[in-house]
Amino acid sequence: MDRILTKEEKQALISLLDLEPQYWGDYGRMQKCYKKKCLQLHPDKGGNEELMQQLNTLWTKLKDGLYRVRLLLGPSQDPNASTSTSRPGEFYNPDTGGYWSYSYGSAGYSDQQKKYWEEFFSKWDVNEDLTCQEELSSSEDEFTPWHPNPPPSPVSISSDSSSSSCDEEYPRNSSRKRKRVHANGSPNTPIQPNKRAHTPGGGRTTIRGDTDIPRTPARESQSTFGSYFNSTEELEEEISQTQQSHHNTTPKKPPPTVSPDDFPTILRGFLSHAIFSNKTQNAFIIYSTKEKCEVLYEQIDKYNPDYKGIFIMKQTEAFVMFMTPGKHRVAAVKSYCCKFCTVSFLLCKAVTKPLELYNCVAKCDDFQILKENKPGLYHFEFCDEKKEVKQIDWNFLTSFAVENELDDPLVIMGHYLEFSQCESSCKKCAEALPRMKVHWANHSQHLENAELFLHCKQQKSICQQAADNVLARRRLKVLESTRQELLAERLNKLLDQLKDLSPVDKHLYLAGVAWYQCMFPDFEMMLLDILKLFTENVPKKRNVLFRGPVNSGKTSLAAAIMNLVGGVALNVNCPADKLNFELGVAIDKFAVVFEDVKGQTGDKRHLQSGLGINNLDNLRDYLDGSVKVNLEKKHVNKRSQIFPPCIVTANEYFFPQTLYARFHKVYNFEVKDFLAKSLEENSYMGRHRVCQSPLTMLIALLWNVPTENFDKSLKEKVETEKKVLSDMCNFTTFAEMCLNIQRGADPLEAL
């Protein structure tokens, strides 16, 4: 075994195993020390990685060397086996004339193995006899006779017999006997049990026959490695049997204590049971023995705890609870504490309710508070007196946008910024103008929410969300409602606006109706036909063309109808590659108007040519309304829908037959000078855009169309407004308005 490792490696291994030099060769003891040191030096247990690697390297080299030595072992038999008087398990050495024991028992003995052992025994110093000095007890019962068939055991060979520990006290009842071997090769004659040798003076001589060989740990280790086995399992089994036989007189060890695998049930409700979580905490509790908790109480100062305390349970187990100013992972805290707990158990968990846990420990009789760095934990240390911060109500702002059909985020933001002002000093609320109804009707309700909105950092996001909410509700309504219902809802809102107008304003809008009556004698029938086409929306029978010279009233009438039904105006005179986003404006609209479309001039040299008519000719599937088309806006996904019906206004351009066939109604406009003169005489109609107002179209319907033609849901309001109009202006007054217009005078002249 000494030839397997060098002297330096041997000393290093003994140092790493914390083993005394005299136990070198005691494989069982060395293996036990190796396992113990593995627990201490393993990196996962907080040990030194370099020392662990060095220990593993030396231990592996030792085991491999022992294995190779065993492979070289083999039996040697007595040349006169039939006449040999040696006991079983002993063999004759022809070079020295001595005997030695064996216990490996392997069959076959090669020349190479024989040569190895000849070199090994040549180093023995056989000139000096092996002796053992000891005094036997006077009692005859204490003498142990030689057994004729002792169990085979290897001879312990020592280079210095005087340095052996024969003078020490050892148990006398050892079951293993050794026979002394003389240099002449003949064993001593065994002494009989009742036979003793005496000195001439009557003294007792030292018996030099069978003696009890002291079994010190050092001799035990030498004896162990003096014999070789066929396998590692036999070696370990022999070691365990040998150790047990030499410790029969020692008291039995108490049964090992079972370490707890979890915290007590009373504390589990205050702890975090997450195992694989990386969440950081600032309160922890450690469960270990009382002695280790006292050590850990001092070691956790590394975390600068604001509070730490030891709680004792059952006088043997304890807990260390501590709270840190910073946050740490449970695994990191446990790994640090495990460095100080090589044998003792240790459990570590995060505390989710530190105050409740402390109160539970303080009140429970099973626990005792051993020490603390400060006198306890109190409720005020965990309570922050924070003022309740009010936040803006997003839903309330959204309801304001939905009620007033505001789909522009900037408009919503502007209203709410004005709502934040004091209501008593608000001019809009003081004037209470009908066109400012959105403001003065909602100022008082949204004042408090608007003040919070004023200091909010997410104003644009809130308004954008409200606008999206309006668009979402509108799209859903378009999908679920019929076009008759949509038109009725639109007229209902206009009736509410008409109700708020003053009599003077109503006279002004009634003059606009008279203005259109002078443009087309059957204006009411024309308006009803257009509304019918838009409402029924029959493919290829839904589009209208307004065609005529400049300043004939095409754009004014088209704009008034679009405002009545809730449509938009589009420009198709742009290049074809820009049409997609222009057409996307028509998403979810009731109708559209292609305003002032240009085309080929033909014989009209005074007109400018353009791409509008050519682009419309390429949009036949849009105009027909037979199939769904893809409409898109910037930053919005494409949407497939039937393109809404349209009104096309154009001058006297050439229309190809493929495009002209898409219009179900064509109205030719003419220039009437008196219409322009009457508008010049009444500046109010121009400034307030009476001719383009939806209220003008609504009053035209109320004035000319019977109540039965309106939707049932509108009849009550229609009858009320009809009565108001008839009381305010009779047919004679209306006829005078028409006469004034035809004369080119102010429609309200002398009225």
Swiss-Prot record:
GO terms for cellular component: host cell nucleus. This is Large T antigen. ATP binds at G548, P549, V550, N551, S552, G553, K554, T555. Isoform large T antigen is a key early protein essential for both driving viral replication and inducing cellular transformation. Plays a role in viral genome replication by driving entry of quiescent cells into the cell cycle and by autoregulating the synthesis of viral early mRNA. Displays highly oncogenic activities by corrupting the host cellular checkpoint mechanisms that guard cell division and the transcription, replication, and repair of DNA. Participates in the modulation of cellular gene expression preceeding viral DNA replication. GO terms for biological process: DNA replication; symbiont-mediated perturbation of host cell cycle G1/S transition checkpoint; symbiont-mediated suppression of host innate immune response; symbiont-mediated suppression of host JAK-STAT cascade via inhibition of JAK1 activity; symbiont-mediated suppression of host type I interferon-mediated signaling pathway. Residues 12-75 form the J domain. Phosphorylated on both serine and threonine residues. Small t antigen inhibits the dephosphorylation by the AC form of PP2A. It comes from Hamster polyomavirus. It comes from the Viruses. The J domain is essential for multiple viral activities, including virion assembly, viral DNA replication, transformation and transcriptional activation. InterPro entries: DnaJ_domain, Helicase_SF3_DNA-vir, J_dom_sf, Lg_T_Ag_polyomavir, Lg_T_Ag_Polyomavir_C, P-loop_NTPase, T_Ag_DNA-bd, Znf_lg_T-Ag_D1-typ. Forms homohexamers in the presence of ATP. Interacts with host HDAC1. Interacts (via LXCXE domain) with host RB1; the interaction induces the aberrant dissociation of RB1-E2F1 complex thereby disrupting RB1's activity. Interacts (via LXCXE domain) with host pRB-related proteins RBL1 and RBL2. Interacts (via C-terminus) with host TOP1 and POLA1 allowing DNA replication. Interacts with host preinitiation complex components TBP, TFIIA and TFIID to regulate transcription initiation. The modification Phosphothreonine is found at T249. Residues 219-232 have a biased composition (Polar residues).
